[in-house]
A protein has these predicted regions:
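Short S/T/G/P-rich N-terminal loop/turn motif that feeds into the first structured element of a domain
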Residues: 1-67, 71-88
Length: 90
């Protein structure tokens, strides 16, 4: 198993657009071998003193944090999928 994780700032007003894009991308990833894709929206992200999710992505006021991950059977499948997705015109 190989897991890729992502932390993304998304303007609150763009949530529906993000979900549409993530759904489309999720289908493409699944077509190339991803076994699970999770999009988790911020509900209770605390501000840290040294670092936190907001600082990690330089989130602006009005942006929500999305923590997502993709599970692949192995790194080789993820690497091959990345190359194919870069050529996929969907």
């Amino acid at each position: 198993m190989y897991i890729q994780g992502f932390v993304i700032p998304v303007p609150e007003g763009n949530k529906d657009k993000y979900i549409d894009a993530a759904t489309s991308m999720g289908q493409i990833m699944a077509d190339y071998g991803a076994t699970e894709i999770v999009e988790a929206w911020e509900e209770d992200v605390k501000d840290g003193k040294t670092t936190d999710f907001r600082m990690a992505v330089k989130a602006e006021p009005g942006e929500k944090i999305v923590f997502s991950w993709v599970i692949w059977p192995d790194k080789a499948t993820a690497d091959a999928a990345h190359d194919k997705m870069m050529q996929d015109e969907r």
